[in-house]
Amino acid sequence: MAAGCSEAPRPAAASDGSLVGQAGVLPCLELPTYAAACALVNSRYSCLVAGPHQRHIALSPRYLNRKRTGIREQLDAELLRYSESLLGVPIAYDNIKVVGELGDIYDDQGHIHLNIEADFVIFCPEPGQKLMGIVNKVSSSHIGCLVHGCFNASIPKPEQLSAEQWQTMEINMGDELEFEVFRLDSDAAGVFCIRGKLNITSLQFKRSEVSEEVTENGTEEAAKKPKKKKKKKDPETYEVDSGTTKLADDADDTPMEESALQNTNNANGIWEEEPKKKKKKKKHQEVQDQDPVFQGSDSSGYQSDHKKKKKKRKHSEEAEFTPPLKCSPKRKGKSNFL
């Protein structure tokens, strides 16, 4: 293990990752610092664990005067690679301590064996757990995500979705995507890779929420419009109807009052300035006192003005003819008396 650890290649730095990203094979990988990695531990679906661990290191004789540098080189070479002793993938470390005062040399091996202790942040996902990634690639066959800025995750197109449905999904570059861990792989160089799986139900739920919001907004607008119209129309129709009824009542009352005034004025020959109701009452009383027999009414009980005029004319004619009848017997009486 000591020889393997010493000869293991160093992980790609940020500059190397940019070259790989330009080729289109892998996105740009950036190793987080220990402080940044500790900040990600408490995030949702991080699958990160922080804690102290001990490691066995075979240090080359050239690092006898630079032990810390040699230890860091070996630990850096193991970052982003699965470690059986750590049961995960280390992404950052700090606070290195050498356990014991002296190292050990076994037989004729030239390396010095040391035990160290350091604080590690380990990425240890398991199949079935959920992760959050940033979308950095969208194609017709899969979606590429970057988890914690350093792990590449590939999410293939689900078999249940057709090509049209896959293209119409609202997933863009830079979006945060939630997925489920399906399988954990590593390439020939030992770089850790994640195979993910989309949750179709969550995607359909998002679509249904959007459609429900659209339908609810449409129904609310459709429900509000007729209500406003009804509120506007009802008072208008009511006001118009009430206005017409009032006008009709006034129109019916005015000709009756005018005709009654004209009849009373023609009969008496005098224009009076008394209220209209009093004139009507006086007319009815005079007609009833003078000639109650000739009062006519319609089937509805309403007394017509035309009949009143006829009655008054007959009454006036009788009044004109009555004086000569009264005078003639007086003259005859006088002649007979003589």
From Swiss-Prot:
Residues 209-338 are annotated as: Disordered. The modification Phosphothreonine is found at T322. One of its GO terms (cellular component) is nucleoplasm. GO terms for biological process: cellular response to leukemia inhibitory factor; DNA-templated transcription initiation; transcription elongation by RNA polymerase I. It is found in: Nucleus, Nucleolus. It comes from the Eukaryota. The modification Phosphoserine is found at S242, S304, S316, S328. Its main location: nucleus. It holds the Pfam family RPA43_OB. Component of RNA polymerase I (Pol I), a DNA-dependent RNA polymerase which synthesizes ribosomal RNA precursors using the four ribonucleoside triphosphates as substrates. Through its association with RRN3/TIF-IA may be involved in recruitment of Pol I to rDNA promoters. PANTHER family: DNA-DIRECTED RNA POLYMERASE I SUBUNIT RPA43, DNA-DIRECTED RNA POLYMERASE II, III. This is DNA-directed RNA polymerase I subunit RPA43. It comes from Homo sapiens.
